[in-house]
Design a protein with these regions (language model features):
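Sec-dependent N-terminal signal peptides
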Residues: 4-15
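Repetitive, compositionally biased segments used for assembly/scaffolding
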Residues: 18-138
Length: 138
């Protein structure tokens, strides 16, 4: 029941997000492409494509790689580090800045949406079953 309510809430927020593809960039200068936040799971650049560079939990450029620079909860470049000083940014294809993708609730200009807030709270469960969560959220 709880999962159904969360899924419904996510669907409502996705209507507005689907209008613009959101891109994730990480690294000290935010010049490392980390994938598309709201692309479908068949897009080769989607963070939801578990077989692609940005969705694989084994890829060095994936936020789902718990041992990697961009996916470890201990890395300052990871969205999952609650104390990250340089988390990834979310921008659109025109370069418009939406905010930082981070679990750090105290960082200035944190990107906050229902989808991102949900991902930041449940990233471990999502990482372990990416395709099922994609189907639930989208």
């Amino acid at each position: 029941m709880k999962r159904a309510i969360i899924t419904l809430a996510m669907l409502l927020c996705m209507v507005s997000l689907q209008a613009q593809t959101l891109l994730i960039y990480g690294g000290s200068d935010h010049d490392v492409f980390l994938g598309k936040l709201n692309a479908d799971c068949y897009d080769s650049e989607s963070i939801w494509n578990e077989y692609g560079t940005y969705g694989s939990k084994y890829s060095s450029k994936s936020i789902w790689n718990e041992y990697g620079t961009y996916g470890s909860e201990y890395s300052s470049y990871s969205p999952w580090n609650e104390y990250a000083s340089t988390p990834p940014v979310v921008v659109d294809s025109r370069g418009n800045f939406y905010g930082y993708l981070t679990a750090n609730e105290f960082i200035s200009q944190r990107y906050s949406s229902r989808l991102v807030d949900f991902i930041c709270r449940h990233y471990k469960q999502i990482r372990d079953d990416l395709s099922s969560w994609y189907n639930e959220l989208f």
